[in-house]
């Protein structure tokens, strides 16, 4: 059985929010839209997003590391949001494992958002129905698109190539290999929701910093230039 | 969690309505067993009508929680898996049975249908009363399980949530029955008042156990498991948006910890000792006003209790919104 998912490489993500904006752009005008913003130019802007990048600082100064952390629906294999839905609007597609919301059935009771430990679902303030990442279901299932384009919008937009997309149940897929070989992990594994999306951890890097590099010194070029000056004409004395 | 007034009124009004209905049936059963003087059928009919009005008010409040109330009829579809769906099915059944019970009493359809044993004559009202009692208890379980079944909200994920809803709802209903009896001046004030006090005390034990459990609760998720980084110090620097979002509004109560603690003291006083003292005092001085005051004080306390119940639950998604938490 196919289980489509994203694998996000935290070692590469630079927090540019390109995935956020391309997700918003594609989905607000497509099958899942609109994803409306309220008060966009005022003091308290708010709106619906499928994907947000959050930034965490790990460690204490000066030994800190910044982790940019994109988070969207993880398309759990045991999605807790599905059984609690009273109308059956929240469902998991049997053919590719994508968790979706049927906007025509949703009554906006918010129960599925309570039942999702990741906070991946957001109630659209205008349409009053629950929305969430669809894994760009309208792109990835569109046979008219070329193979290259049949990927979620965020994956195509990522300039650092931090996002991989594929079938995590296929052991030979790019995503399965990445999870296997680069230590891919799931979020909040303690709940048994088995998220299909995985994250690739940041890798340890060691950098040698010479203490001299940390203090400001005179321009080394000038230092080297301190030759014995004997009064002959130099380049500096030339009048142009 | 953000306490929504719709859900606060939904759960408290349904609880009082079901409790009042249970009180009416209990009173009738006691009269059948000849422990109490039999009441005019009108007494049960009017009592059921008040219970029905409370249930309707609760149902009305629930619609304010929905983004798309016009589609509420769809909510009965997933009764196999969703407690919310089950509540949507059981609530109209309870309302129908309460209505039928009231109507049967109003028109005095009390001719015995058949006899059990030597003395127990079963009439329509008794049958409806038993069925309604079962449905009411089922409704208490369904309403409470909506919250108790969400395993990520560990403050709610306990059988004590169910016992709180049951006992506090029943207590407020019996308190209302005592107030009703005092208002029309019939001798059942003591009977209902005593049951109301017993249920209030059981409710107190249940709620205190709940508070004690939650005070010692160890949350399963940490910011480390939430983003998958094993380091003791993880501090959020940006939440991915300049303003708020659904996540920052729905999962936070936005009040200070000290207000939360003060409100806990307020409801513990309003729900438990004051109504019990008022009922006790009404026995001593024979006042008909005190049970009525006792009900309103307790109900006001229950509104705060329900607010606290929602506010004190900490959702794991809050780990991704540390600056709001």
UniProtKB/Swiss-Prot annotation, chain A:
Residues 4-34, 64-95, 97-126 form the 4Fe-4S ferredoxin-type domain. It is a peripheral membrane protein. [4Fe-4S] cluster binds at residues 13, 16, 19, 23, 73, 76, 81, 85, 106, 109, 112, 116. It is found in: Cell inner membrane. Its main location: membrane. One of its GO terms (molecular function) is 4 iron, 4 sulfur cluster binding. InterPro entries: 4Fe4S_Fe-S-bd, 4Fe4S_Fe_S_CS, ET_IronSulfur_Cluster-Binding. Binds 3 [4Fe-4S] clusters. Its cofactor is [4Fe-4S] cluster. GO terms for cellular component: plasma membrane. Keywords: 4Fe-4S, Cell inner membrane, Cell membrane, Electron transport, Iron, Iron-sulfur, Membrane, Metal-binding, Repeat, Transport. Part of the SoeABC complex that catalyzes the oxidation of sulfite to sulfate. SoeB is probably the electron transfer subunit. Forms a heterotrimeric membrane-bound complex composed of a catalytic heterodimer (SoeAB) and a membrane anchor protein (SoeC). This is Sulfite dehydrogenase subunit B. The gene is soeB.
Curated annotation (Swiss-Prot), chain B:
It comes from Allochromatium vinosum (strain ATCC 17899 / DSM 180 / NBRC 103801 / NCIMB 10441 / D) (Chromatium vinosum). Keywords: Cell inner membrane, Cell membrane, Membrane, Transmembrane, Transmembrane helix. It comes from the Bacteria. Part of the SoeABC complex that catalyzes the oxidation of sulfite to sulfate. SoeC probably anchors and stabilizes the catalytic subunits. The chain crosses the membrane at residues 5-25, 43-63, 87-107, 126-146, 165-185, 186-206, 266-286, 290-310. Forms a heterotrimeric membrane-bound complex composed of a catalytic heterodimer (SoeAB) and a membrane anchor protein (SoeC). InterPro entries: DmsC (IPR007059). Pfam families: DmsC (PF04976). One of its GO terms (cellular component) is plasma membrane. One of its GO terms (molecular function) is dimethyl sulfoxide reductase activity. It is a multi-pass membrane protein. Disulfide bonds: none annotated. GO terms for biological process: anaerobic electron transport chain. Belongs to the DmsC family. It is found in: Cell inner membrane. The lineage of its organism: Bacteria, Pseudomonadati, Pseudomonadota, Gammaproteobacteria, Chromatiales. The keyword Signal does not apply. Its main location: membrane. This is Sulfite dehydrogenase subunit C.
């Amino acid at each position: 059985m196919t289980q489509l998912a994203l694998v996000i490489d935290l070692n590469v993500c630079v927090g540019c929010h390109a995935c956020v904006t391309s997700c918003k752009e594609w989905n607000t005008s497509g099958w899942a839209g609109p994803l409306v913003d309220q008060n966009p130019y005022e003091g308290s802007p708010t709106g619906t997003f499928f994907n947000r990048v959050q930034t965490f600082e790990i460690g204490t100064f000066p030994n800190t590391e910044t982790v940019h952390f994109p988070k969207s629906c993880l398309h759990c294999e045991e999605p807790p949001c599905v059984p609690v839905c009273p109308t059956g609007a929240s469902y998991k597609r049997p053919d590719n494992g994508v968790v979706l919301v049927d906007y025509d059935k949703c009554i906006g009771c918010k129960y599925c958002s309570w039942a999702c430990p990741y906070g991946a679902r957001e109630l659209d303030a205008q349409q009053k129905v629950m929305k969430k990442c669809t894994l760009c279901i309208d792109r990835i299932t569109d046979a008219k698109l070329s193979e290259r384009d049949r990927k979620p919008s965020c994956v195509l937009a990522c300039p650092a190539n931090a996002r991989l997309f594929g079938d995590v149940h296929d052991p030979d897929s790019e995503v399965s290999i990445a999870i296997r070989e680069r230590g891919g992990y799931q979020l909040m594994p303690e709940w048994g929701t088995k998220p299909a999306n995985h994250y690739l951890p940041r890798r340890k890097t060691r950098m040698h910093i010479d203490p001299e590099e940390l203090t400001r010194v005179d321009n080394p070029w000038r230092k080297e230039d301190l030759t014995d000056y004997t009064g002959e004409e130099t380049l500096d004395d030339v009048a142009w | 969690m953000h306490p929504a007034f719709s859900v606060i009124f939904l759960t408290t009004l349904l609880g009082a309505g079901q409790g009042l209905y249970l009180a009416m049936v209990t009173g009738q059963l006691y009269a059948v067993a000849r422990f109490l003087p039999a009441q005019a059928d009108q007494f049960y009919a009017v009592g059921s009508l008040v219970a029905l009005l409370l249930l309707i008010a609760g149902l009305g409040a629930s619609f304010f929680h929905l983004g798309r109330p016009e589609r509420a009829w769809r909510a009965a579809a997933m009764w196999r898996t969703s407690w919310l769906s089950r509540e949507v099915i059981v609530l109209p059944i309870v309302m129908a049975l309460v209505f039928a019970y009231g109507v049967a009493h109003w028109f005095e359809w009390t001719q015995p249908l058949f006899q059990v044993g030597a003395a127990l004559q079963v009439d329509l009202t008794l049958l409806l009363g038993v069925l309604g009692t079962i449905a009411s208890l089922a409704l208490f379980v369904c309403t409470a399980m909506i919250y108790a079944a969400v395993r990520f909200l560990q403050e709610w994920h306990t059988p004590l949530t169910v016992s709180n809803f049951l006992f506090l709802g029943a207590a407020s209903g019996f308190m209302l029955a005592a107030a009703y009896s005092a208002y029309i001046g019939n001798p059942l004030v003591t009977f209902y008042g005593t049951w109301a006090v017993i249920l209030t005390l059981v409710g107190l034990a249940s709620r205190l156990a709940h508070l004690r459990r939650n005070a010692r609760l160890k949350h399963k998720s940490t910011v480390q498991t939430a983003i998958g980084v094993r380091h003791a110090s993880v501090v959020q620097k940006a939440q991915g948006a300049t303003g708020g979002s659904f996540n920052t509004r729905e999962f936070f109560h936005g009040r200070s910890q000290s207000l939360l603690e003060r409100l806990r003291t307020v409801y513990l006083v309003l729900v438990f000792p004051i109504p019990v003292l008022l009922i006790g005092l009404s026995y001593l001085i024979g006042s008909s006003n005190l049970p009525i005051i006792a009900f309103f004080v307790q109900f006001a306390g229950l509104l705060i209790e329900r607010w606290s119940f929602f506010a004190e639950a900490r959702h794991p998604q809050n780990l991704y919104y540390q600056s709001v938490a």
